[in-house]
A protein has these predicted regions:
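Mature extracytoplasmic enzyme cores
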Residues: 1-274, 278-290, 311-314, 398-400
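Acidic, low-complexity N-terminal propeptides/linkers enriched in Ser/Thr/Asp/Gly that mediate export
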Residues: 132, 144-148, 155-156, 197, ...
């Protein structure tokens, strides 16, 4: 029993009479982009390691409903992978994509979930996982034998620290991947002393793991909160786990808000604004639908990010920019009060964290305006929660204005 994906044999997340299993995505970087040095404008040959190579021209046929003939698209393949974009107007033009999913597939991979579905113990489950390649998963496991485990499964490239963080020179052999991490070197744990395993897309290991991750795909707050909560339980019940799954407590707010409040200058705030500060000071970091504090916190933090990272955000409309993660803003508040990013370059003076945090607070209250005086304007209304159809285009099959 469990969840499946149309077209893929077997149950992806579920249980049988003996074991249960689930998964989340691994945050490992499995895609790199290489700038191709073409020999001439025909773009049929390119340079690599001081020698010329020919591209493979692959004609893709795209069938279109209602059309008598397919659309033909010629793709140039380098030894790295396809040159995805050709238009000079595209930021990724003339870049070859090396993506692990385009590697020659393992023919045994299609059998993994039927094998997991029939597994009776961890040994059989672990043997089935060895055939899995992409997309890499954090598999959690439990059995009637009392075993619990987590296996990180997938074909993960071996790369140097920071390799692939930015576009690589496609003419240099040193920039190629160094192979793939052997399956038996992928992180895994069976029956750990702490008596639980958990994954919420967070980083899987500490820094002692010998293979670089090279990418943090997710902020770690959710994973850290789940692990902290489980660690505090001595005899977890089904009810405890249900409460954890429906918890709206924010570890992010717990860590960020005290730093924001400690940097807030109250001197020029009127009585109404000081009342909002008191509301935030007494907040329990739970995003209850009837609460107002979650509105104040989220809007204040967003305004803080906008002012703090203005030198980066100014390029949003012109070039592709890596967005700064929330944890980095919290880290700036806690550990880097003298960092140059706190300064607004357009002003003659040098701003401090107190200046920026206070400016963001005032900006937040101005943005919310009259809504701050409306007793019915709560997190439920502000959040505007909706559940769209998976296609994102069939509105009658979605739920909107849930609040």
């Amino acid at each position: 029993y469990g969840a499946s994906i149309p077209g893929l044999p077997g149950v992806i997340i579920g249980f049988n009479e003996h074991i249960a299993w689930g998964s989340t995505n691994v945050g490992q970087d499995v895609t790199d982009w290489y700038a191709i040095d073409w020999v001439d404008d025909t773009k049929t040959r390119y340079r690599f390691n001081g020698k010329e190579r020919e591209v493979e021209m692959v004609v893709e046929e795209i069938q279109v409903k209602g059309a008598s003939d397919p659309i033909l698209d010629t793709i140039r393949y380098t030894h790295f992978g396809p040159v995805v974009y050709r238009s000079e107007d595209d930021d990724y033009h003339d870049l070859a994509m090396h993506w692990v999913s385009l590697e020659t597939p393992n023919p045994e991979e299609i059998t993994i979930f039927p094998r997991i579905n029939r597994s009776k113990n961890y040994a059989e489950f672990d043997a089935a996982c060895a055939s899995y390649e992409t997309p890499a998963q954090n598999f959690v496991f439990a059995s009637n034998d009392g075993d619990i485990a987590m296996n990180i499964v997938g074909r993960l490239p071996i790369k140097r620290e920071e390799q692939g963080r930015f576009v690589l020179d496609g003419d240099i052999q040193h920039n190629e991947w160094m192979g793939f991490i052997p399956y038996d070197k992928n992180p895994k744990v069976l029956n750990p002393p702490r008596q639980f395993v958990a994954s919420a897309n967070q980083r899987t290991t500490d820094d002692t793991y010998p293979y670089p991750y090279n990418r943090e795909s997710f902020d770690q707050y959710r994973g850290r909160y789940i692990n902290r909560t489980l660690d505090s339980m001595s005899n977890a019940t089904v009810k405890d786990m249900m409460n954890l799954q429906t918890s709206s407590y924010s570890l992010f707010a717990e860590e960020a808000l005290p730093l924001m409040l400690s940097n807030l200058n109250l001197t020029n705030l009127n009585a109404i604004l000081k009342g909002l500060v008191e509301l935030l000071e007494s907040w329990d970091y739970i995003f209850e639908k009837e609460a107002v504090a979650p509105i104040l916190f989220t809007e204040w933090f967003e305004d803080l990010e906008e002012v703090l990272w203005d030198e980066i955000n100014v390029y949003d409309d012109s070039i592709s920019v890596l967005q700064v993660r929330k944890w980095r803003t919290v880290d700036m508040l806690e550990n880097h009060p003298l960092n140059v990013f706190w300064d607004i370059t357009q002003t003659p003076g040098r701003e401090t964290p107190e200046d920026i945090v206070t400016q963001a607070f005032v900006s937040m209250t101005e943005d919310l305006g009259w809504r701050l005086q409306d007793s019915e304007y709560t997190w439920e209304v502000h959040r505007e929660t909706y559940i769209a159809h998976l296609s994102r285009s069939l509105e009658p099959f979605g739920r909107y204005n849930i609040s």
